[in-house]
Curated annotation (Swiss-Prot):
Belongs to the UDP-glycosyltransferase family. PANTHER family: GLYCOSYLTRANSFERASE. The active site is at H20 (proton acceptor), D108 (charge relay). It catalyses: 2-cis-(+)-abscisate + UDP-alpha-D-glucose = beta-D-glucopyranosyl cis-(+)-abscisate + UDP. The gene is AOG. One of its GO terms (molecular function) is abscisic acid glucosyltransferase activity. Keywords: Glycosyltransferase, Transferase. It comes from Phaseolus angularis (Azuki bean). PROSITE patterns: UDPGT. UDP-alpha-D-glucose binds at A340, Q342, H357, W360, N361, S362, E365, E381, Q382. This is Abscisate beta-glucosyltransferase. Optimum pH is 6.0-7.3. An anthocyanidin binds at H20, A380.
């Protein structure tokens, strides 16, 4: 690739958590591939996590770099997720913006304190929201609903003012939607950040949720650029393996195991980087997977232990006795602990289905790989994503969880092994319904790939934002 001459300078300021950090790094790389000078604002702790892929991009001539802010956020604090206070980065950010004055800064929604300093310096600020058009529309239309007609948390209600007939329950909603009058200050801060922004970058693509993309673009007071799936910037095996952080599993062992399986024969199960399932839920998943008699690869991340228990993932009684040995002997299953190269796994020819927590990154990665899903939402906007997958796109089946899980709270809503087995069989065993889900999933995957190519809708939106920033620069200079 020849060296690109930068057209505009854009700063990308990701949040420290993996689920928010990874897609914004991908977005920065995507904009760099369009000729925008992209600078990623990182901390001493986060810079090493993506230094290798940025160095590779630089060798290919892309105008991309990392600026490490002088302050840091302690890694031990990242476990509190979206509630982590990152305002220690405010002064280093202010000094950098005074020195460099980029044409635009893309800010993660969780840096809710950043709005004032960017606004004060007159730099256009674009919000990176991290969820899709459908979920944004659901949230916006539920934000001012009092739910007066609902008598219990389990009673269904119709989501108003959206193109599809979608029912939800109070138990599937985060607290700030259940009780809009009691919105915490942090959520109000994020809403204010959105309202004062120049526009919003959305990691999705038009053909995935066209009615909702149109709704956002026509009704939002600010501008929206739909630029995904940004994960397509990861072309090489190295990019996919090292995305986010180095895998903590034996990558080659994982790929060798998958290579030994027939095409379209394996279920991939993973619940993301932050979800912490308790041992009793892990056991039910294990029993359900075994009873389904389907081949699977299961990545177990963090475990929600009682305070008195050993907290090492490799210890404790969190799998049925003899389970892993039986899976090894029969060749039916592979259990992995820690961080796995999800893009590589999902794109492998052996993968037939994906059991997922419906985080937006995982949802888009499953969509892009053309893999139908078993949906197991836990928190955030994941129940809305489940509705998109199973009721709008019709490319998945629900496992049956009905309880929204408050962050770091006691686990609720245990899903039994029978429901796990039924969902796995429904997705993995050949049937007219399963075949139709796979056909739709493959069709959508093709549209995802075309969206980021020249002539695609996401490609056009990236170009449109760059051109708008160029026009603003010319107007200011004139």
């Amino acid at each position: 690739m020849k060296t690109l001459t930068p057209s505009v300078e854009i700063f990308f300021f990701p949040y420290v958590g993996g689920g928010h950090q990874i897609p914004m790094i991908d977005a920065a790389r995507m904009f760099a591939s369009h000729g925008a000078s992209s600078t990623i604002l990182a901390t001493p702790s986060t810079t090493p996590l993506f230094q290798k892929c940025i160095t590779r991009d630089q060798k290919f001539g892309l105008p991309i770099s990392i600026h490490t802010l002088s302050a840091d956020v302690p890694q031990s604090d990242i476990s509190v997720g979206p509630f982590l206070d990152t305002s220690a980065l405010l002064e280093p950010l202010r000094q950098l913006l005074l020195q460099r004055r980029p044409h635009c800064i893309v800010v993660d929604m969780f840096h809710r304190w950043s709005g004032d300093v960017v606004y004060e310096l007159g730099i256009p600020r674009t919000l990176f929201n991290g969820i899709g058009c459908f979920a944004l529309c659901v949230q916006e239309n539920l934000r001012h609903v009092a739910f007066k007609s609902v008598s219990t948390d389990s009673e269904p209600f119709l989501v108003p003012n959206i193109p599809d007939r979608i029912e939800m329950t109070m138990s599937q909603l985060p607290p700030f939607l259940r009780n809009p009058s009691g919105i915490p200050e942090r959520w109000r801060g994020m809403k204010q950040l959105e309202e004062k922004s120049f526009g919003t970058l959305i990691n999705s693509f038009y053909d995935l949720e066209p009615a909702y993309a149109d709704l956002i673009k026509s009704k939002w007071g600010n501008k929206a650029w739909i630029v995904g799936p940004v994960s397509f910037c990861n072309r090489s095996k190295e990019d996919k393996t090292e995305r986010g952080k180095p895998p903590t599993i034996d990558e080659q062992n994982c790929l060798n195991w998958l290579n030994s399986k027939k095409p379209s024969s394996v279920l991939y199960a993973s619940f993301g980087s932050l979800a912490r399932l308790p041992p009793e839920q892990l056991k039910e998943i294990a029993y359900g997977l075994e009873a389904s008699e389907q081949s699977f690869i299961w990545v177990v991340g963090n475990i929600l232990h009682n305070p008195s228990e050993n907290k090492e993932n490799g210890s404790g009684n969190w799998l049925p006795e003899g389970f892993e040995q039986r899976m090894k002997e029969t060749g039916k299953g592979l259990v992995l602990r820690g961080w796995a190269p999800q893009l590589l796994i999902l794109e492998h020819a052996a993968i037939k289905g994906f059991m997922t927590h419906c985080g937006w990154n995982s949802t888009l990665e499953g969509v892009s790989a053309g893999v139908p899903m078993i949906t197991w939402p836990l928190t955030a906007e994941q129940f809305s994503n489940e509705k998109l997958i199973t009721e709008v796109l019709k490319t998945g089946v629900q496992v049956g969880n009905r309880e929204w899980w408050p962050w770091n709270a006691e686990w609720k809503g245990l899903v039994g092994r029978e429901k796990v087995e039924v969902a796995v069989r429904k997705l993995m065993v050949e049937s007219v319904e399963a075949d139709e889900m796979r056909r739709r999933a493959k069709d959508i995957a093709g549209k995802a790939a075309r969206a980021v190519e020249e002539g695609g809708t996401s490609y056009a939106d990236v170009e449109a934002l760059i051109q708008e920033l160029q026009a603003r620069t010319c107007a200011n200079q004139g």
